[in-house]
Amino acid sequence: MARTKQTARKSTGGKAPRKQLATKAARKSAPSTGGVKKPHRYRPGTVALREIRRYQKSTELLIRKLPFQRLAREIAQDFKTDLRFQSAAIGALQEASEAYLVGLFEDTNLCAIHAKRVTIMPKDIQLARRIRGERA
C-alpha cells in the first residue's frame, strides 16, 4: 500500500469511544455470570491433520473385524454358497483390502494435489485407477 500524506482534521470535542468501551465491558461480564460456556472447537483442518499423523504411525487394522467378515462372506455368496472361511483367511483378506485402499487413497490425494485442490473427489479416484491400469 502506498503511503499517503495525512491532513489535520478538526476535532469534535468530547471522546465518544469511552462510552462504547464501557458498554463492551458490561457485555463481556454479563454472560459469564449466567451464560453457558461455549465448547472449545479446533480450527478446520487441525483435527484432520492430527488424525493423519495418528493413523500413519499406527499399524492396526482400520476397518472393524466383524463388519468386514460379514461383507467378505456376502461377496463370496455370489460365487459359491456354503463357503467356509478360516479366521486367518479373513485376516489376510482384510489386510490386503486395507493395503489396497490406503494405496488408492494415496494416489487419489496426489491426483487432487495435481489439480491444485486439497479435497479428493470421485474423479480423482477414477483417474488414479485409470493410471494404474485397473479400469479402462
Swiss-Prot record:
Where are the Phosphotyrosine residues found in this chain? Y42
Domains as described in the record:
Specific interaction of trimethylated form at 'Lys-36' (H3.3K36me3) with ZMYND11 is mediated by the encapsulation of Ser-32 residue with a composite pocket formed by the tandem bromo-PWWP domains. Interacts with ZMYND11; when trimethylated at 'Lys-36' (H3.3K36me3).
**Residue positions of the PTM 5-glutamyl dopamine?**
Q6
Residues modified as Citrulline: R3, R9, R18, R27
According to the UniProt record, list the residues that bear Symmetric dimethylarginine.
Answer: R9
Q: What does this protein do?
A: Variant histone H3 which replaces conventional H3 in a wide range of nucleosomes in active genes. Constitutes the predominant form of histone H3 in non-dividing cells and is incorporated into chromatin independently of DNA synthesis. Deposited at sites of nucleosomal displacement throughout transcribed genes, suggesting that it represents an epigenetic imprint of transcriptionally active chromatin. Nucleosomes wrap and compact DNA into chromatin, limiting DNA accessibility to the cellular machineries which require DNA as a template.
Residues with the modification N6,N6,N6-trimethyllysine, per the entry, are: K5, K10, K28, K37, K57, K80
The family this protein is said to belong to: Belongs to the histone H3 family.
Instruction: Give the organism's phylogenetic lineage.
Output: Eukaryota, Metazoa, Chordata, Craniata, Vertebrata
What name appears for this protein in its UniProt entry? Histone H3.3
Main subcellular localisation: nucleus
Q: Which residues does the annotated region (Disordered) include?
A: 1-43
Where is the PTM N6-acetyllysine found along the chain? K5, K10, K15, K19, K24, K28, K37, K57, K80, K116, K123
Lipidation, kind N6-decanoyllysine: residue numbers?
K19
Q: Which residues carry this modification: Phosphothreonine?
A: T4, T7, T12, T81, T108
Any one Pfam family match given in the protein's UniProt record, by short name: Histone
Name the Gene3D superfamilies for this protein. Histone, subunit A (1.10.20.10)
**Location of this chain's protein in the cell:** Nucleus; Chromosome
Instruction: Output one GO MF annotation.
Output: DNA binding
